[in-house]
């Protein structure tokens, strides 16, 4: 009982801290907070938290201590144990305001899927098989392949100082390995050059700062056909060779690299539920797949993605970092689970969910191995790291990026029927806080999105004033794009794209105008409501 009480006290402290960071605005406050971008000491970069001594696993309880601070953030972690400052970690241009100006991976923006030597990816196969709800394919998307010059100017006009995008492996290296596609190389080089030349909006020489993700769910179909993609250890060599090309060709101007975007989504959605390509699953976890084993394959896909990440990181450190002065890390999907009740069982279920979703990827990068509960529950179904592999992956990141999308209520499921339950034995109910508005008129006059951004920034400032080492964040997203599950019917961008018009014109929404004024310090933010600890506890334990 004492252990349960201690856990409950710790959890309540975590919930309070998360509250300050994430929701900022659902109850009452003693005084309103007014601030502008100058109140953010590191600017509005997508929140980077720098901690010394990443390799000294005994000095920090990671990811557990950090999870309470950083849902929805990027963290900068120094893997070599030195007391690296924020500026050292990210270069002289770090202290600037930043917005994420692109969707999660290039296919949703670029389009031109069959042009200039690009070969199919697994997402092309998926959409062309009629799997999208609106029967769209994304072949055109937001036409970024042809309209990127216009979009870079729009970024500059808006006041953006950083741009985050991923590279299409199938466009750069059409067969997945071997010869580079000259047209693909030309496209990415010109995009990067155009971003860098927009230096007049920045107080340093780097123009619009570039953050590149090497891989985000868009695997070359050629390699998928050859050896089942992430299920095979052969991916490690091919991914490292692909990363080598990117570091060599673009590293003179790119200082921030993410290896694999959301490897836990890759594993769960691609190989457990099978709702995204390569659509592998088995009942009862997924029922619409032609092949797969949901009890084994997600673990192997994640395992190989961790090893591929570490291999690429070590390559960058050994071959490029000294000259290029960049940083490299990974990025994971994150939601925050709340216990449905005060019971010890539900509180323990929260930790299991964290271990099986976040710790699954982060524990190997810190400790060199999976969480103990995962190894116990999954047994022989989860691969083991050799001693050499453990040394390779431990500390293999300059930063860890965390994408936060939603929060969940969690209850214990360990005493219920096992059919249909995951290894962590917890039932979850999702509580979304998105800001997509689907009617065109409402989308353009998106007051709810403005309120959301204002509240989120207010929560960030509150966390800063309460001691959290928060440095900024990217806003999602710059343009309406082809979305993973909703196709062209989920306008989450700050700028509207008219997908009914063949020319795909862009039009700033109210949120784009508001954010641009905020970036230029023409307006501030007034936070009139904060959630008190008592009200927060009542909200989640009523």
Swiss-Prot record:
This is Putative beta-glucosidase 23. The active site is at 262 (proton donor). Belongs to the glycosyl hydrolase 1 family. A beta-D-glucoside binds at residues 88, 216, 405, 476, 492. GO terms for biological process: carbohydrate metabolic process. The keyword Disulfide bond applies. Glycans are attached at residues 34, 135, 445. Residues 1-29 form the signal peptide. The gene is BGLU23. GO terms for molecular function: beta-D-fucosidase activity; beta-galactosidase activity; beta-glucosidase activity. It holds the Pfam family Glyco_hydro_1.
């Amino acid at each position: 009982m004492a252990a349960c009480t201690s856990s409950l006290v710790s959890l309540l402290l975590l919930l309070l801290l998360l509250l300050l960071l994430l929701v900022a605005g659902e109850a009452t406050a003693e005084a309103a907070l007014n601030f502008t971008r100058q109140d953010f000491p590191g600017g509005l970069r997508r929140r980077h938290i720098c901690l010394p001594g990443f390799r000294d696993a005994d000095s920090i309880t990671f990811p557990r201590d950090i999870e309470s601070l950083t849902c929805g953030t990027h963290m900068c972690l120094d893997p070599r144990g030195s007391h690296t400052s924020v500026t050292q970690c990210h270069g002289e241009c770090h202290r600037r305001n930043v917005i994420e100006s692109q969707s999660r991976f290039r296919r949703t923006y670029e389009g031109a899927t069959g042009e200039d030597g690009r070969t199919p990816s697994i997402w092309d196969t998926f959409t062309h098989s009629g799997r999208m709800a609106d029967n769209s394919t994304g072949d055109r998307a937001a036409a970024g392949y042809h309209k990127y010059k216009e979009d870079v100017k729009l970024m500059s006009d808006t006041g953006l100082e950083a741009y985050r995008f991923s590279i299409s492996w199938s466009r750069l290296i059409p067969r997945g390995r071997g010869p580079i596609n000259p047209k693909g190389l030309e496209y990415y080089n010109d995009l990067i050059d155009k971003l860098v030349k927009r230096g007049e909006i920045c107080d340093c020489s780097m123009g619009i700062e570039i953050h590149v993700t090497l891989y985000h769910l868009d695997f070359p179909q050629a390699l998928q056909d050859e050896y089942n993609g992430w299920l095979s250890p052969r991916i490690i060599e091919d991914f490292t060779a692909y990363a080598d090309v990117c570091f060599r060709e673009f590293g003179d101007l790119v200082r921030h690299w993410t290896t694999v975007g959301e490897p836990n989504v890759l594993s769960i959605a691609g190989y457990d539920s099978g709702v995204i390509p390569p659509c592998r699953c088995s009942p009862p976890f997924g029922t619409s797949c032609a092949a797969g084993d949901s009890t084994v394959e997600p673990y192997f896909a994640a395992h190989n993605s961790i090893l591929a990440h570490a291999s690429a990181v070590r390559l960058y450190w050994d071959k490029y970092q000294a000259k290029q002065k960049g940083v490299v890390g990974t990025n994971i999907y994150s939601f925050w689970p709340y216990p449905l009740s005060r019971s010890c069982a539900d509180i323990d279920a929260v930790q299991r969910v964290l271990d099986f979703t976040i710790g699954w990827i982060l524990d190997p990068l810190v400790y060199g191995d999976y969480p103990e509960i995962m190894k116990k529950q999954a047994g022989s179904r989860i691969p083991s790291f050799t001693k050499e592999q453990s040394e390779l992956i431990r500390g293999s990141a300059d930063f860890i990026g965390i994408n936060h999308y939603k929060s969940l209520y969690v209850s214990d499921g360990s005493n219920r029927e096992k059919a249909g339950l995951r290894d962590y034995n917890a039932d979850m109910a999702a509580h979304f806080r998105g800001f997509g508005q689907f009617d065109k008129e409402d989308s353009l006059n998106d007051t709810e999105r403005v309120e959301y951004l204002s509240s989120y920034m207010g929560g960030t400032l509150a966390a800063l004033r309460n001691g959290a080492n928060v440095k900024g964040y990217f806003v999602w997203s710059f343009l309406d794009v082809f979305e993973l599950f909703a196709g062209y019917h989920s306008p989450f961008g700050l700028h509207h794209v008219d997908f009914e018009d063949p020319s795909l014109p862009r039009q700033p929404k109210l949120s784009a105008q508001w954010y641009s004024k905020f970036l230029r310090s023409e307006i501030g933010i007034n936070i009139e409501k904060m959630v008190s600890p008592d009200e927060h506890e009542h909200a989640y334990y009523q």
